[in-house]
């Protein structure tokens, strides 16, 4: 009788252990499934954050270039490569540091994709006068083609336009004064074209 009870207890114990083991396996499976889902969710969030950071980094990398470009356009309106040029009323001007003849000065300006200055307004005359005080500078004015017919380098004449000749000029003294320069007083004077003086180049504002 005691042996039968013992045998029944053993069977009950074994059955309970199996059921408990199955429950433990199911719990482990659920935990693994939840862990996998959580890992997938975290990976998705991480990838999204990485993508957002990459986008922000690209923006930050491009911003300095834009900022530098904006800064350069404010500091050097005539272009970062034209820092020796001066801006005035929508155009750029170069005041030379060396002296040469009128024709050489004209060629120098053309090499810099510009031309000898054309003074066609009182405002521009004042700008040049202030900038060239006590020195002589070539301007883009000559009567080499026809004596007394003064023309700017762009082909326009001075008969109906602004002029600022010094009193008594142009006088063609010596019969070969065919090029004009700004006198030390800021007024214009005719002189022979081989005379060496400074010069002013002019060009449009870069687009």
From Swiss-Prot:
Q: Which residues lie on this side of the membrane: Extracellular?
A: 49-207
Pfam families per the UniProt record, alphabetical: Lectin_C
Q: Which UniProt keywords apply?
A: Acetylation, Disulfide bond, Endocytosis, Glycoprotein, Lectin, Membrane, Receptor, Signal-anchor, Transmembrane, Transmembrane helix
Query: Which residue ranges does the entry give as Cytoplasmic-facing topology?
Result: 1-23
Query: InterPro entries given for it?
Result: C-type_lectin-like, C-type_lectin-like/link_sf, C-type_lectin/snaclec_domain, C-type_lectin_CS, CD209-like_CTLD, CTDL_fold
Q: Which SMART domains match?
A: CLECT (SM00034)
Glycan-carrying positions:
67
The C-type lectin domain covers 77-203
Q: How does it sit in the membrane?
A: Single-pass type II membrane protein
Q: Where in the cell is it found?
A: Membrane
Q: Name one GO biological process term.
A: endocytosis
Q: Which cysteines are joined by disulfide bonds?
A: 78-92, 109-201, 179-193
Chief localization: membrane
Q: Which CDD domains match?
A: CLECT_DC-SIGN_like (cd03590)
| Post-translational modification, as annotated | Some or all of the cysteines are involved in disulfide bonds.
Residues bearing N-acetylmethionine? Answer: 1
Q: What does this protein do?
A: Hepatic lectin is a membrane receptor protein that recognizes and binds exposed N-acetylglucosamine moieties of plasma glycoproteins, thus mediating their clearance (from the circulation) and endocytosis.
Q: What is this protein called?
A: Hepatic lectin
**Species of the source:** Gallus gallus
């Amino acid at each position: 009788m005691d042996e039968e009870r013992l045998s029944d207890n053993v069977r009950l114990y074994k059955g309970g252990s199996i059921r408990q083991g199955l429950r433990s396996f199911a719990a482990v499976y659920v935990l693994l499934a939840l862990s996998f889902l959580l890992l997938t969710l975290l990976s998705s969030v991480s990838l999204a954050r990485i993508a957002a950071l990459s986008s922000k980094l690209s923006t930050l990398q491009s911003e300095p270039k834009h900022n530098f470009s904006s800064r350069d356009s404010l500091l050097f309106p005539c272009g970062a490569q034209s820092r020796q040029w001066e801006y005035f009323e929508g155009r750029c001007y170069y005041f030379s540091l060396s002296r040469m003849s009128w024709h050489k000065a004209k060629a120098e300006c053309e090499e810099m994709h510009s031309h000898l200055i054309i003074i066609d307004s009182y405002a521009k005359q004042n700008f040049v006068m202030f900038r060239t005080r006590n020195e002589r500078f070539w301007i883009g004015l000559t009567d080499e083609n026809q004596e007394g017919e003064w023309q700017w380098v762009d082909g326009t004449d001075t008969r109906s336009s602004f002029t600022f000749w010094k009193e008594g000029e142009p006088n063609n003294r010596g019969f070969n004064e065919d090029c004009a320069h700004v006198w030390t007083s800021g007024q214009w004077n005719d002189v022979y074209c081989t005379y060496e003086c400074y010069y002013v180049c002019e060009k449009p504002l870069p687009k």
